[in-house]
From Swiss-Prot:
Pfam families according to UniProt: Ribosomal_S3Ae
Species of provenance: Vanderwaltozyma polyspora (strain ATCC 22028 / DSM 70294 / BCRC 21397 / CBS 2163 / NBRC 10782 / NRRL Y-8283 / UCD 57-17)
Predominant location: cytoplasm
PANTHER family per UniProt: 40S RIBOSOMAL PROTEIN S3A
Matching InterPro entries: Ribosomal_eS1, Ribosomal_eS1_CS, Ribosomal_eS1_euk
Protein name: Small ribosomal subunit protein eS1
Subcellular location(s) per record: Cytoplasm
């Protein structure tokens, strides 16, 4: 048999190993920056493919949503059960400027609050902020024993539940409509709205564990770079040029 027709020799070339290329050589790191509303602005890093040809890395990063624990943003473990969503709106060099995109509770926190011998009350409203962000806000509350109560249970009647739900909806609507998205975020962190709901409903039925459980962003206005820069404490109109001392005197002396 001729050598050129030997199948074993012809198949030997196909067994060569291909050169392994590290996929991370085609990627680059970017720093995620949280708005100035939070104490810790350095959220972390994210990966993206490098810009090649018509594909720009900035286009792949814009709109990316990251989920961060509020305890990491505030430096306090008291907020460990709340998760904040941040959306990348602008790319500046190696920094990604983000904006608030939503909030949620961890599953274990919600389950730990649900107990027997009490009534769970939930309410949600869809409201537009003063800067045209449409949000759906979810609130949760639980009844508790009244003062000097002997009975073990603290169940609320249907009329009480409807009245409490109405008060919660009114407070949420008023607080959201009268605030910008940044102002609302600053109210959600110290739970100012929760205490207001608890005080407003104490005459109907005493409540405990009142929380804004979830905030969902439904619609956002047209992107404004100036507003985003002001949110991150950069490029505000209050910055003025520094006065150059002694410049006028030096010019007069030379003349």
């Amino acid at each position: 048999m001729a050598v050129g027709k030997n199948k074993r020799l012809s198949k030997g070339k196909k067994g060569l190993k291909k050169k392994v290329v590290d996929p991370f050589t085609r990627k680059e790191w970017f720093d995620i920056k949280a708005p100035s509303t939070f104490e810790n602005r350095n959220v972390g890093k994210t990966l993206v493919n490098k810009s090649t040809g018509l594909k720009n890395a900035a286009d792949a990063l814009k709109g990316r949503v990251v989920e961060v624990c509020l305890a990491d943003l505030q430096g306090s473990e008291d907020h460990s059960f709340r998760k904040i969503k941040l959306r990348v709106d602008e790319v500046q060099g190696k920094n990604l400027l983000t904006n608030f995109h939503g909030m949620d509770f961890t599953t274990d926190k919600v389950r730990s609050m649900v107990r027997k011998w009490q009534t769970l009350i939930e309410a949600n409203v869809t409201v537009k902020t003063s800067d045209d962000y449409v949000l759906r806000v979810f609130a949760i509350a639980f009844t508790r024993k009244q003062s000097n109560q002997v009975k073990r249970t603290s169940y609320a009647q249907s009329s009480h539940i409807r009245a409490i739900r109405k008060v919660i909806s009114e407070i949420l609507t008023r607080e959201v409509q009268g605030s910008t998205l940044a102002q609302l975020t600053s109210k959600l962190i110290p739970e100012v709205i929760n205490k207001e709901i608890e005080n407003a409903t104490k005459d109907i039925f005493p409540l405990q564990n009142v929380h804004i459980r979830k905030v969902k962003l439904l619609k956002q206005p047209k992107f404004d770079l100036g507003s985003l820069m002001a949110l991150h404490g950069e490029g505000s109109g209050e910055e003025k040029g520094k006065k150059v001392s002694g410049f006028k005197d030096e010019v007069l002396e030379t003349v």
